[in-house]
Each structure stands twice: as C-alpha cells, then as structure tokens.
C-alpha cells in the first residue's frame, strides 16, 4: 500500500474556540444599534421571549406516560404566553428604531420650547431602563417623584412667599366675620383646645418620623400652630373700629 501523502499526526482534540476581540468600530456600531429612548421596550420584549421559551421547555420535559398531561400543559402555556409572544415577536428592530427616531425628533422640537431639562431625556431614558431592570417600577416611580419635587420646590416656594401674606389676611378677615354669627364663639371655645392638642401631636409624630428617616414623613407638612394662634386668636386692627364682644380673642383653656 502506498503511504499517505500527509505524515502529520491525526489529532482527536476539538478545535479551540476562537475569540474575536471587539474593535472600537464594532463597539461603536453596537452602541448605535441600541435604542436611545425605547431601550426598555427592547428589554421587555427580550424578557417575554425568554419566559415563553422557558415555559415551553418545561412543558416538554415530561414526555412518556404523562404525555397527555404534558400536552394539556403545553396547550395552556401556548394559550397564555402565545399572544404576548406574538405581539413582541412581530415588532422588528427596524420598527423600534423608527419609533425611537420619532421620539428623538419630538424631544428636539420640545427642546426649543421648554426648559433645558429636556436635553437630559436620552440619559434619563437609559437610567429609567436600568432602574426598571434592577429595582422595578416602584423604585423608578419613587425616584421620579423625588426629582419632580426637587424641580418644583423652588417655584412653589416663590409662589408661597408671594401669596402667603394675602392668604393669611383673607383667612383672618373670614375668621372675624364668622365670629359675628351666634353660637360660633362658644363652639370654637370648646373645639379649639382639642384641635390644638391634635395638631401638636401630629407635628411631633411627623418630626419623629423624619428623624428616623421615614421617606413619607419628609414630605408631610407641619401644622403652623403658632401662626394660626396669631392669625385666628386676634382680629385685624382695621377689621372694625370698635369690635363687638363676639370678636374678642378667644381665651385659652
């Protein structure tokens, strides 16, 4: 017999896996492939596909004598997961890219009409997508609420400073007019001590909760008991030249 044309030894070892390192150009292309605004939609679609595949594989594990039961489970899984799978499976990446571009155009249009905070939309969208994956919607809602409060607080403080004196004066005038009615002074003398006690207890509870780090307590307002005592305890000087006995300060008990 003629010798083989190749004297190289035959190796039974499997071929080594070749690892391809990503170049900066490849990473840039992959980054461009990601969605800027609708990344969370892509993540939701991927999670639905994984859950559907896992449920289908679980239904297939019991082949054999229990096949009729497995077929029943498989049919149930298809009936429940199938519509969700079909809905997300039919949304190609090109369509998501199109929607993402439309969102971007809307943000750019809004950028000319609203404050610069809109410029942070792409970063906020990525941050929201990460929060949804890590902590769920509850944590995201809490963070967004805190952010909204932080942005609205300066404006609210300005409005409060501007209109507080007017509101305080109107409240005192209304209180003085109300005390002219029969029986009102005697009723308020009976009610105010209990109301003052409850207000003080409420303020103490809120302050203690804030010291313990309660997130809810930090947003609860305190009852301005001293200001209420000053406003409602004494009639305005110009409310009447000679106030009637009903308008005299309510004695504390």
Swiss-Prot record:
Annotated segments matching region Disordered: 1-26
Basic and acidic residues bias (residue ranges): 13-26
Residues spanning the membrane: none
Taxonomy, superkingdom: Eukaryota
Entries under InterPro entries matching the protein: REF
Stated family: Belongs to the REF/SRPP family.
PANTHER family, per the entry: REF/SRPP-LIKE PROTEIN OS05G0151300/LOC_OS05G05940, REF_SRPP-LIKE PROTEIN OS05G0151300_LOC_OS05G05940
Protein name stated in the entry: REF/SRPP-like protein OsI_017815
UniProt source species: Oryza sativa subsp. indica
